[in-house]
């Protein structure tokens, strides 16, 4: 009987260090903000220790996004990431630094890797040139969403995309995003940000399947 108490404590610790989400949820976990959203289907999001998370999705989910990071975000953070991005070239998915600002309402992406669809092809968008950061070239495109879901309900708003060329690819990935470089370049093109809401290093899937296990710092 003397061994029951330490065994119970160990079991509670193991369970508490990992949490699987099946429904939309935001919050804080191990010092990081997290966000998980899906519009349908069986996608799951697992909160691991520290800045680590895992996402698992199939074609039963139309669209989902999840990640860990900070709330509020800022314009000068350097974000490091590493882990496994388990998709193939036919899967519609992004691996990106992702966030929102208000006043103006902006949804932004720094896309480090993607599958079958590049956001540089968004319809009705405008190409905003390219710049170099961290030894890579990023192509920039501004897109417009009309009457679309946002962090303040259904709205019309601009999206900013910085897309890494060449992309990181699939499988084991690692790198860093110096967000200040992107903010400065966007501003030089007349693409301002507003007051930061959340800022996460996210995995997103659209009508696809895959698995990601990513650590953010």
From Swiss-Prot:
The entry annotates sugar attachment on 56, 80
Gene Ontology annotations for the cellular component aspect, listed alphabetically: extracellular region
- In what tissue types does this protein appear? Expressed in larval carcasses and gut, and adult gut.
Gene3D superfamilies, alphabetically?
Answer: 2.60.120.180
Instruction: Point out the coiled-coil segments of this chain.
Output: none
Look up the signal peptide feature and give its range: 1-17
Source domain of life is Eukaryota
Keyword annotations for this protein? Carbohydrate metabolism, Digestion, Glycoprotein, Glycosidase, Hydrolase, Polysaccharide degradation, Secreted, Signal, Xylan degradation
- What's the name of the protein? Endo-1,4-beta-xylanase
| Protein source organism | Phaedon cochleariae (Mustard beetle)
The organism's taxonomy opens as:
Eukaryota, Metazoa, Ecdysozoa, Arthropoda, Hexapoda
């Amino acid at each position: 009987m003397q061994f029951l108490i330490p065994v119970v404590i160990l079991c509670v610790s193991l369970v508490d260090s990992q949490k699987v989400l099946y429904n939309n949820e935001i919050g804080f976990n191990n010092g990081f903000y997290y966000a998980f959203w899906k519009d349908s289907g069986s996608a799951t999001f697992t909160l691991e220790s520290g800045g680590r998370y895992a996402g698992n999705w199939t074609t039963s989910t139309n669209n989902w996004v999840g990640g860990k990071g900070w709330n509020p975000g800022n314009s000068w953070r350097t974000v490091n990431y590493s882990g496994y991005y388990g998709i193939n070239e036919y899967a519609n998915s992004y691996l990106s630094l992702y966030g929102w600002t208000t006043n103006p309402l902006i949804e932004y992406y720094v896309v480090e890797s993607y599958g079958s669809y590049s956001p540089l092809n968004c319809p009705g968008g405008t190409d905003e040139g390219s710049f170099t950061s961290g030894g890579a070239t990023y192509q920039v495109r501004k897109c417009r969403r009309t009457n679309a879901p946002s962090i303040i309900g259904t709205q019309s708003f601009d999206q900013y995309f910085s897309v890494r060329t060449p992309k990181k690819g699939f499988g084991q990935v690692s790198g860093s995003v110096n967000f200040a470089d992107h903010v400065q370049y966007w501003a030089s093109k007349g693409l301002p940000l507003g007051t930061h809401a959340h800022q996460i290093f996210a995995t997103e899937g659209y009508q696809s399947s895959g698995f990601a296990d990513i650590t953010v710092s």
